[in-house]
């Protein structure tokens, strides 16, 4: 009997680990679906603050639409003059790495953003290029760390650790911990940890508004760098559910049109 118990214990542990990992991924997946839109258009204000509180402000126009299993996003900077015309195209692929291109009007050239640049700063802000696209859950090991109350909301703490060093280099962090509200599956906050395991950045989501399709959209997002004191905020100025833009609009040719 004792021998049977010793044989069964590792199996029970393995099964419980698999169930926990599956549950954690399911929570992360539901959190993504809670804010997933097939099509939308919006304008937003990006505010970039340095460690002394000095601000730079950028106005952005953004359009996104899903074609089959692929989500395509095109954003253009409207102001100020030094960034006006800068544009980015993001192709969110379901089962492979995302594709990104950026057009710099000063160079009159469109170039591809390679995978090692996705964890780099998005236009000088504390957001990364990767933050502009939807996360690929298959690139992480997911684990429930427990529960926590954040701003009066009962949340799951779900850790997503990069599968390998290559993904760490691509993302710009080693792991992240998301605080996901249990009733709505809306992500309230995400903590990012650097390659040494130290807290790096914290992103908070606020002013969620329910749309006509039953999904929610966060009208404010803030990223705080805990290591250098800098922060950046994206505030949605106008939001439109749906889009009539054709698929050929989401192309590198459109990037270069002013």
Question: What kind of feature is each model-predicted range?
Answer:
Residues 62-65, 143-149, 206-208:
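Short amphipathic beta-strand and strand-loop transition segments with alternating hydrophobic
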Residues 23-106, 110:
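N-terminal mature ectodomain segment of secretory-pathway/periplasmic proteins
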Residues 89, 99, 103, 109-113, ...:
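Gly/Pro-enriched, hydrophobic low-complexity segments
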Residues 22, 41, 46-53, 80-82, ...:
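Mature-chain termini and adjacent capping regions
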Residues 25, 56-57, 132-145, 197-202:
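A short, amphipathic edge element
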Residues 1-6:
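Positively charged n-region of N-terminal signal peptides that target proteins for export
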Residues 17-21:
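Sec/Tat signal peptide C-region and signal peptidase I cleavage site
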Residues 7-16:
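Bacterial N-terminal signal peptides
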């Amino acid at each position: 009997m004792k021998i049977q118990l010793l044989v069964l214990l590792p199996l029970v542990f393995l099964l419980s680990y698999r169930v926990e990992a599956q549950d954690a991924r399911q929570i992360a997946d539901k959190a993504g679906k809670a804010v997933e839109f097939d099509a939308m258009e919006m304008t937003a204000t990006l505010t970039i603050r340095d460690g002394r509180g000095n601000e730079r402000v950028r106005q952005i126009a953004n359009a996104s639409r899903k074609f089959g299993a692929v989500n395509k996003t095109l954003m253009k900077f409207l102001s100020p003059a030094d960034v006006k015309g800068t544009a980015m195209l993001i192709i969110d692929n379901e089962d492979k790495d995302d594709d990104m291109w950026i057009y710099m009007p000063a160079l009159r050239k469109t170039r591809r953003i390679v995978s090692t640049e996705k964890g780099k700063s998005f236009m000088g802000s504390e957001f990364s290029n990767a933050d502009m696209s939807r996360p690929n859950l298959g690139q992480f090991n997911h684990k429930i760390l427990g529960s926590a109350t954040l701003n009066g909301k009962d949340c799951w703490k779900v850790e997503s650790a990069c599968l390998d060093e290559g993904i760490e280099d691509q993302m710009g962090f080693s792991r992240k911990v998301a605080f996901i509200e249990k009733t709505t599956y809306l992500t309230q906050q995400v903590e990012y940890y650097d390659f040494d395991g130290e807290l790096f950045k914290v992103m908070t989501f606020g002013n969620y508004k329910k749309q006509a399709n039953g999904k929610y959209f966060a009208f404010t997002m803030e990223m705080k760098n805990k290591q250098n004191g800098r922060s950046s905020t994206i505030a949605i100025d106008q939001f439109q559910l749906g889009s009539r833009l054709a698929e050929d609009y989401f192309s590198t040719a459109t990037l270069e049109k002013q």
